[in-house]
Regions:
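Short beta-strand to alpha-helix junction loop
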Residues: 174-183, 211-216, 253-269, 382-387, ...
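Helix-loop-beta segment of a Rossmann-like dinucleotide-binding subdomain
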Residues: 171-172, 198-208, 234-273, 373-377, ...
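C-terminal catalytic lobe of FAD-dependent flavoproteins
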Residues: 406-526
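The AdoMet/dcAdoMet-binding core of the Class I SAM-like
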Residues: 2-92, 97
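Hydrophobic Val/Ile/Leu positions in short beta-strands of Rossmann-like dinucleotide-binding domains
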Residues: 29, 124-125, 147
Length: 526
C-alpha cells in the first residue's frame, strides 16, 4: 500500500514504470486542472491514460476527486489550495507543514481523526451496501473481516429489485452535491470492476424529467453551468423520447453513465472475497470494550458466542442506533416501498431508467421496478397495499402510457424496508467518540457553540460507523467505505476535509449539546 505523490501531472509512462505491478498504489496528484492531452507509448502507460480518460468524465472541479485504480488502490486529484489542509486531516500521511492551515478547524477537535491503531481483526456489523463495501475496501487490501448480519444479505434498505445510480444534484454548491458527485464516479468504476455489464446491473443511463417548473429550472441551470460536461446534458422532449424508446411527456437532463443496479448482486460479489467471512441470521446482543479489544456478543439459531476485534464498523442502517457505542444517537427512520411489475407482451419497455418524483427502471429478470414511497417515522417493513397503490398512482400521474402497459393485476410485488437518515440528510461516516466523555469535555458548548475548545476528542479506539445513507446508498456508501478503510489503514482519504467534517459521526452528539437537547445514550453493557 504505497503512496505516490506528484505536484503536477506525471507522464503516464513514467508513472507506470514507477509503480510497476503495485495493485494497491495510492496516487495523489496535486493539480488545478486536467491536462489537455494524455499520451503514452508503453502498454502499462496506455492503460493509465485510459483510466484517466474515464475518470475525467466524472470530474466536476471538486476540491478532492477520487477514482479506483487497479484492484485495490485509488487515484486522487487534489486542488493545490486545499492540499496542506487535507494532509493535516489524514493521519498516516506525511505532513511537512507545522502550522495549521485553516484556524476554523482547530476548535473542533471532535471532527478530526484519531491516531492509527494496530489492526488485529475487524468486525463489520451489517451486510447491506455499506457493510459489504466497507468489508470489501479492507479485504482487498489484505485485511480479514467478519461481517455479522442479523437477517440475510441485502435484506433491508439494500433489498430492492433495482435501484438507480445517478446523482440528483443541486445547481448550487452544497455539501450534498459535493458528496454525490464524489460518490457517483467512484461507485460507477467500482461497480464496473466488480460485475460485467448485464450481470446484476443495466448500463442504461438515466433521464431526470422536467416534470415541474422547479425541476426544469434546476436542470437548465445545471446544463448551462456545465455546457461541456460529458456527465450530463439537457435533452428536449423529442430527444428524451428517442433515448428512452417510448414517448415521454417532458424534456429532461440525460445522465448517460447512470445505471440500474440489483443491489443484492453487487453486495454478494463483494462479500465473496476470500478474506471476508459472513455470519447471517446472527444477532448482536452486546458490544463492549475488554482490555484492548472489542467484544461482540452474538447469537444465531444454534448458539451464543463472542467475537473479539481491534476494530468494529457499524453499518446496520436503521438498526445502528440500537448498538453500543451509538445506541440512542438521533438517527431517523423512514419507511420506503418499491413495486415490481411485468410489462405486457406487446408493449415496448423503456430503454433507460426514468426519474421524476419517483423512478422506474427498464426490465431486469422480467420485472420493472418503480417507486418509492417515503414515510418518516414509520418502522413497519411489511409490504402494504396502501404503499403499492401510492406507487401506481405516482407512476400513472407522470407516465400514464407506460403504467397502462404494465401488468397491475398481480398480488403485492416489491420490497419494503426502513431507511436510515440523519437530521441534515447526510451519511454518518467516520470514527466514533465516547459520547458520555464528550458531553463532559465539551459541556461549554451548551452555553456557546463557538467556544474555542482545544481538548482532544475522547475516541473509542477502533470504533467506526458507516450508516444513514437514506435512499442514496448506491452512490454514497462505497466512497464512504473507502474513507473508513483509509482511516483505519492510514491511507489517503478520498474525501475533502469539508466532507470529512460534514459526515463525521461526532456531529450528532455535539449538536445535542449546542441545541440544548438530550438523548438516552447507552453505556457499554459490561
Amino acid at each position: 500500500m504505497s503512496v505516490y505523490t506528484f505536484h503536477g501531472w506525471p507522464k503516464p509512462d513514467e508513472l507506470a514504470e514507477k509503480i510497476g505491478s503495485d495493485e494497491q498504489a495510492e496516487i495523489i496528484i496535486i493539480a488545478q486542472n486536467w491536462p489537455e492531452s494524455l499520451t503514452a507509448q508503453s502498454p502499462a502507460g496506455q492503460i493509465i491514460v485510459q483510466l484517466w480518460v474515464e475518470a475525467r468524465i466524472f470530474w466536476q472541479h471538486q476540491p478532492v476527486f477520487s477514482y479506483p485504480f487497479r484492484y485495490a488502490g485509488k487515484f486522487i486529484l487534489i486542488q493545490p489550495h486545499v492540499y496542506e489542509q487535507w494532509v493535516q486531516f489524514n493521519p498516516g500521511i506525511v505532513c511537512t507543514s507545522t502550522t495549521p492551515v485553516y484556524s476554523e478547524f482547530r476548535y473542533k477537535p471532535w471532527l478530526t481523526l484519531p491516531d492509527l491503531l494496530p489492526i488485529k481483526s475487524v468486525v463489520v456489523i451489517g451486510a447491506g451496501i455499506a457493510g459489504a463495501a466497507t468489508a470489501f475496501a479492507l479485504a482487498k487490501r489484505g485485511i480479514a473481516v467478519t461481517v455479522i448480519e442479523q437477517h440475510t444479505i441485502a435484506s433491508a434498505a439494500s433489498g430492492n429489485h433495482l435501484g438507480l445510480l445517478y446523482a440528483k444534484i443541486s445547481a448550487h454548491a452544497t455539501v450534498q452535491t459535493e458528496l454525490l458527485l464524489a460518490g457517483y464516479g467512484y461507485s460507477r468504476a467500482l461497480l464496473s470492476n466488480c460485475l460485467p455489464t448485464g450481470q446484476g446491473w443495466l448500463d442504461c443511463g438515466v433521464i431526470h424529467l422536467n416534470y415541474n417548473s422547479k425541476e426544469q429550472q434546476r436542470n437548465m441551470l445545471l446544463a448551462n453551468q456545465n455546457p461541456q460536461s460529458k456527465l450530463f446534458h439537457a435533452v428536449t422532449q423529442e430527444e428524451a423520447s428517442q433515448i428512452a424508446g417510448i414517448d415521454l411527456p417532458h424534456s429532461g437532463l440525460w445522465w448517460p453513465y447512470g445505471a440500474a443496479i440489483n443491489p443484492l448482486s453487487w453486495i454478494q460479489n463483494m462479500l465473496r472475497h476470500p478474506l471476508i467471512q459472513v455470519l447471517t441470521t446472527t444477532k448482536v446482543n452486546a458490544i463492549c470494550r475488554q482490555k484492548d479489544l472489542w467484544q461482540i456478543d452474538c447469537k444465531n439459531q444454534l448458539e451464543a458466542f463472542s467475537l473479539n476485534a481491534s476494530h468494529i464498523v457499524i453499518c446496520a442502517g436503521a438498526e445502528s442506533n440500537f448498538l453500543y457505542p451509538v445506541a440512542g444517537w438521533p438517527l431517523h427512520k423512514i419507511r420506503g416501498q418499491t413495486t415490481t411489475a411485468s410489462i405486457k407482451q406487446e408493449a415496448v419497455q423503456p430503454h433507460c431508467a426514468l426519474s421524476a418524483n419517483s423512478y422506474i427502471t427498464p426490465q431486469w429478470r422480467d420485472k420493472l421496478c418503480f417507486g418509492a414511497t417515503f414515510h418518516p417515522n414509520q418502522t413497519n417493513d411489511d409490504l402494504t397495499s396502501e404503499d403499492e397503490k401510492e406507487n401506481w398512482q405516482q407512476l400513472r400521474q407522470w407516465m400514464p402510457h407506460l403504467a397502462a402497459n404494465l401488468d397491475s393485476d398481480n398480488p403485492l410485488q416489491g420490497h419494503a424496508a426502513i431507511r436510515c437518515d440523519a437530521y441534515d440528510h447526510l451519511p454518518v461516516v467516520g470514527p466514533i467518540g465516547d459520547t458520555s466523555a464528550m458531553f463532559k469535555y465539551y459541556a461549554q458548548l451548551r452555553m456557546d457553540k463557538n467556544y474555542p475548545l482545544t481538548q482532544s476528542c475522547p475516541w473509542l479506539p477502533g470504533a467506526f460507523i458507516n450508516t444513514a445513507h437514506g435512499s442514496r446508498g448506491l452512490i454514497t456508501a462505497p466512497l464512504c467505505a473507502e474513507a473508513i478503510a483509509a482511516s483505519i489503514l492510514g491511507l489517503p482519504s478520498p474525501l475533502s476535509v469539508h466532507l470529512q467534517q460534514a459526515l463525521h459521526p461526532n456531529r450528532l452528539p455535539i449538536r445535542m449539546l449546542t441545541h440544548h437537547q438530550s438523548f438516552a445514550f447507552a453505556e457499554q453493557t459490561k
